Amino acid sequence: LQLTRASENYFVEVKKNTNLENFVWTQRPIVIFANSEKDPNFISQIEFLSEDLQALEERDIVVLVDTNPSNSSLLRKRLRPHGFAFILIGKDGQVKLRKPSPWNIREIARVIDKMPIRQQEMDRQKQEKK
């Protein structure tokens, strides 16, 4: 996985013991599964996400990447992907969205911005600016 220095803070390679519990109430994981780094859907998804790192930061998104099916990570066992999968996890640790194809950052932001916890965050940010 080739990442720029700026994007390294947002993209994390899944290890065998990577656990979603580590992100509950602090970040919104987007889990990207593919059978290979060469998967065209995987490549497109990483490009889409890399286009607007600020949008990822504003929404507390961390992107967890697993392109090794033989790894049998905790995430693979829990989420059971088939080939490419885009899975959005809320800050509460629950699956909010599961897609078999890439999503652009605008679509992702729209879904997240409708979530109750995100609405509270945006309200709080507005109050702080006053």
Give residue ranges: language-model regions.
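Non-catalytic interaction/Regulatory regions outside core domains
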Residues: L1-K130
